[in-house]
């Protein structure tokens, strides 16, 4: 059987009542050609509009356990708020979580009980992907502009192939621009193989501006831009065993921009903020740090992260770092060296301790 549908309305009041939550205002329109063939339901030449948002494409829903949804959809403009329930918003106090500083790893071991010593940061809970059992997907998407998406700026030219089948999620040929002012592309796989959950990440970002320690009123274009490459893989039956099996490489190159020293204090725990002030002593007296460039290279092999090279250059200092973070033992051993740059009015004698080491348990 076949059916052609064309419907429209002046506003979204009826849809808001059905969903029992606010939706963006505007006209409503839908048209498409519906076909029912055996156990499959087709929507061909679909065009839907809700307010300024629109979707078009072809869909095929195949009945079964689980049901299967195939097709391709595109949009010239999509407001992601349509898919968010504003009546279910969580509230936070806005206060940062502070961690009690530890002076020395050996001294810390003396202060904790044997039970506390057995506690580990990475949970040893099984990874379950039952949510993937709800539906099989085989979709190609192309969105020209998406707004209100997870706190990002308007995302442009979002493209991806998404396949979900048998507890395996594959996102391939992902491309997007406007992600924190930059571009993102790559592939991602999360799959269950027998008793193990496998993850494969191959992503590249260009000119991403995260602004995690922004100065109040700071504009996006003055955040330090970051080019990042991440290639990781691993498999495990718990979050802990998966982390300890990770292999790969992360490389980031950072450009010029400003960060707020006071905001860093809110983002970091006490011990890491003290470390930040130790390797950047000017943060104690100056409100901002002007970063000029930075290079960060981390290699992972079976859960052991080797910080191969970290070089950070501000307008007044050069900071070097190297070390290891072992997810098997959950211990960290990282050293830092701070050098004053020539011709900026800072001498080595002005640095209380140019060498800083962070070691101990995570």
Regions found by a protein language model. Give the residues of each.
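Small-residue helix/turn framework positions
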Residues: 1-54, 64-92, 131-152, 157-362
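Intrinsically disordered, low-complexity segments enriched in small/polar residues
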Residues: 86-130
């Amino acid at each position: 059987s076949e059916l052609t549908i064309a419907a429209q309305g002046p506003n979204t009041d009826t849809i808001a009542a059905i969903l029992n939550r606010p939706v963006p205002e505007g006209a409503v329109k839908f048209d498409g050609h519906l076909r029912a063939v055996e156990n499959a339901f087709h929507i061909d030449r679909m065009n839907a509009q809700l307010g300024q948002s629109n979707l078009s494409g072809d869909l095929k829903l195949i009945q079964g356990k689980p049901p299967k949804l195939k097709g391709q959809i595109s949009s010239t403009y999509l407001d992601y708020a349509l898919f968010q329930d504003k009546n279910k918003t969580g509230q936070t106090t806005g206060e940062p979580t502070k961690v009690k500083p530890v002076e020395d790893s050996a001294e810390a071991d003396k202060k904790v009980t044997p039970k506390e010593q057995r506690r580990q940061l990475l949970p040893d809970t099984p990874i379950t992907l039952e949510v993937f059992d709800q539906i099989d997907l085989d979709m190609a998407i192309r969105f020209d502009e998406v707004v209100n998406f997870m706190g990002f700026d308007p995302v442009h030219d979002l493209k991806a192939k998404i396949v979900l089948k048998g507890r395996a999620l594959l996102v391939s040929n992902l491309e997007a621009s406007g992600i924190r002012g930059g571009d993102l592309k790559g592939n991602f796989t999360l799959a269950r193989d027998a008793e193990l959950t496998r993850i494969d990440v191959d992503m590249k970002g260009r000119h991403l501006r995260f602004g995690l320690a922004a100065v109040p009123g700071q504009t996006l274009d003055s955040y330090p831009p970051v080019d990042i490459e991440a290639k990781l893989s691993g498999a495990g039956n718990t979050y802990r065993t998966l982390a300890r099996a990770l292999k790969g490489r992360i490389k980031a190159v950072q450009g010029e921009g400003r960060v707020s020293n006071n905001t860093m204090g809110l983002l970091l725990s006490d011990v890491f903020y003290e470390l930040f002030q130790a390797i950047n002593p000017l943060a104690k007296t100056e409100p901002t740090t002007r970063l000029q460039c930075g290079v960060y290279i981390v290699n992972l092999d079976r859960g052991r992260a080797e910080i191969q090279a970290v070089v950070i250059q501000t307008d007044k200092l050069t900071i070097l770092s190297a070390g290891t973070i072992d997810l098997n033992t959950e211990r960290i051993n990282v050293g830092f060296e701070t050098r004053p740059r020539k011709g900026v009015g800072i001498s080595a004698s002005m640095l209380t301790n140019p060498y800083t080491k962070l070691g101990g348990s995570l």
